[in-house]
Amino acid sequence: MSKLWGGRFTEEAEAWVEEFGASISFDQQLVNQDINGSIAHVTMLAKQGIVTKEEAEKIKIGLQYLLEEAKQNKLHFSVEAEDIHLNIEKMLIEKIGEVGGKLHTGRSRNDQVATDMHLYLNEKVEHIIKATKQLQTVLVHQAENNIETIMPGYTHLQRAQPISFAHHILAYFWMLERDVNRYEDSLKRINISPLGAGALAGTTFPIDREYSAELLGFNGIYENSLDAVSDRDFILEFLSNSSMLMMHLSRFCEELILWSSQEFQFIEMSDQYATGSSIMPQKKNPDMAELIRGKTGRVYGNLFSLLTVMKGLPLAYNKDLQEDKEGMFDTVKTVEGCLHIMAGMLETMTVNKEKMGQAVTQDFSNATEIADYLANKGLPFRQAHEIVGKLVLHCTQKGIYLVDVPLETYKEMSSLFEEDLYEVLSPYAAVKRRNSAGGTGFEQIEKALEKAKGLVGEFVGIK
């Protein structure tokens, strides 16, 4: 077939060269955005008198037809037409005649593809924000059901202090809230229009960029045509935000994997989100959590891939920028899938409250309580720390826990110890007392839940 840009050339490219340079195998995902962008563009051309109203109406009818065909997956794309833009233009000309060739007046594929990607990400980021808030809702529900479920809190993966399981869950709620905030802020940079920037220098036609931007729902336009066609910061920002979101999901998945093991037994995954072994009949593997953890590296890779593509590009457009799309598409699909799986996995998991409770009665996570007990009686905390350290050593040598130590032994360490210290050793009491702002105390968790509901309630119907 003849190329829409073929006037300059006397030889045709080899078929394998065409295939190497074509992007239609993946950028066809932009078909709706491409057609909607073209409808806005030709509407603007008619308003400015660059094409007649009759020509514009004929072009728009043709584009609307192609849009309906696209929604029903009836369009057939060709490698020879290279990309989504030339495929649509070719189909349009075949449908309505040569007047379809006027669509590209005052426009380049450079600003066209940038517009498509802005429209695409604007829509997909909104979807991801919604899916993240749905996951946050699941976390709120689990936290509400586990306010008084006591578990070990960890540092260095060693038992540190008793905490509420709800407090642990809500830590991830606030991580996801930062992710939502980052995505929402990025929309300010996604929601600007490059349409009308041309190949790199603008156009001699009297176009109205603000009008076409308004038709497409953009909040403004790029102020520099070179920047408009060469900018991929908005994609990099999306990939960066998605990498942080996936990192948060991966951290939680790592804990779910540990907690579901025989060594912990804190939770049990629903059969819906676990698999078995082909050889070991007893196995119940947390495959979905492992896959989310693994797919995090995939999203990181997409970020670093585009950063590497961009680092050496002179202004303005370069064919290297064709490599900006597959990682973007892949990240959208990966993040959306992981969010939905994570929500279902957390919603259906069983919390073993008894095992968690046993864990905080068979360790030394209440040691800080004794140090605080002494400090509250006027002993410098460093001295209290030293005394409790010796008590823990004594217990490990005897094979007992702090609650098993007789009062006489405590008094040998410090005369400040009294009978009331055993009340301090209760994990439940230890958690309840930690009512500093943001702490694990039950009153603080109730306050945190109210704030959390306020953030997602309007969006997902929590009252």
Swiss-Prot record:
GO annotation terms (biological process): arginine biosynthetic process via ornithine; L-arginine biosynthetic process
Top-level lineage group: Bacteria
Gene3D superfamilies referenced in this protein's UniProt entry, alphabetically: Fumarase/aspartase (C-terminal domain), Fumarase/aspartase (Central domain), Fumarase/aspartase (N-terminal domain)
UniProt entry keywords in alphabetical sequence: Amino-acid biosynthesis, Arginine biosynthesis, Cytoplasm, Lyase
Residue pairs linked by disulfide bridges in the UniProt entry: none
Primary localization class, coarse: cytoplasm
Known EC number: 4.3.2.1
Family recorded in the similarity comment: Belongs to the lyase 1 family. Argininosuccinate lyase subfamily.
Name the record gives this protein: Argininosuccinate lyase
